[in-house]
Amino acid sequence: MSQQLQQIIDNTWENRAELSPKAASAEIREAVAHAIEQLDRGALRVAEKIDGAWTVHQWLKKAVLLSFRLEDNAPMPAGGYSQFYDKVPSKFANYTAEDFAAGGFRVVPPAIARRGSFIAKNVVLMPSYTNIGAYVDEGTMVDTWATVGSCAQIGKNVHLSGGVGIGGVLEPLQANPVIIEDNCFIGARSEVVEGVIVEENSVISMGVYLGQSTKIYDRETGEVTYGRIPAGSVVVAGNLPAKDGTHSLYCAVIVKKVDAKTRAKVGLNELLRGD
């Protein structure tokens, strides 16, 4: 079924300029709707780890983008306090008490998750925003004013602190989604964008900004890398001096690496403050 679905989505994508709410076959509508429904249930996901490496399913990103071409904007009531006007309804618009109980997660007002995002059991959504295509795995906390961007992949037992921004990457299509692996802590007001991968058991301090062009400096080795935080890293904001010594530019600094056992035993403040 997935292969047939992928073929329809890929073929439709090649002719997307001709697509509109009034110019789409029933087959296309059903294929896109089914893909979004599978993302919403967590049966499919935009990226998954296969044999130790992350694989991005670009056709599912195409399905998300095509869904915007198939719908007109429409009024969406918001419990009497406001009204919205958009193409994508809330994930929870038609949820019953039984649906919430089966989902096993908490949604604190006024948290918003768009249809097509997946929220796993024991997740807590504080007043936050989770966009279409995102996958939030079990036991994760999305704290107040945090944003989980389109198609971002958040692992198990992750803590996204207040005001954290996890970037969404639907366009350009070839770009990969942001991935935060299991048991990571992302400090308040930090930003992770442009397909950066934060590997498991890492701690990102408050106010760290990570994009593909951000230099990641390993204090122990002196190595500078881009786009990936190695497993078990403790990262703080820093600066690197220019070669001519006239100025310095922002970077992220890996101050130490810890294993899962140490990460579990030692408090976050101690990890971040220790030399």
Swiss-Prot record:
It holds the Pfam family Hexapep_2. Keywords: Acyltransferase, Amino-acid biosynthesis, Cytoplasm, Diaminopimelate biosynthesis, Lysine biosynthesis, Repeat, Transferase. Substrate binds at R106, D143. GO terms for molecular function: 2,3,4,5-tetrahydropyridine-2,6-dicarboxylate N-succinyltransferase activity; nucleotidyltransferase activity. PROSITE patterns: HEXAPEP_TRANSFERASES. One of its GO terms (cellular component) is cytoplasm. It is an enzyme of class 2 (transferase). It comes from the Bacteria. GO terms for biological process: diaminopimelate biosynthetic process; lysine biosynthetic process via diaminopimelate. This is 2,3,4,5-tetrahydropyridine-2,6-dicarboxylate N-succinyltransferase.
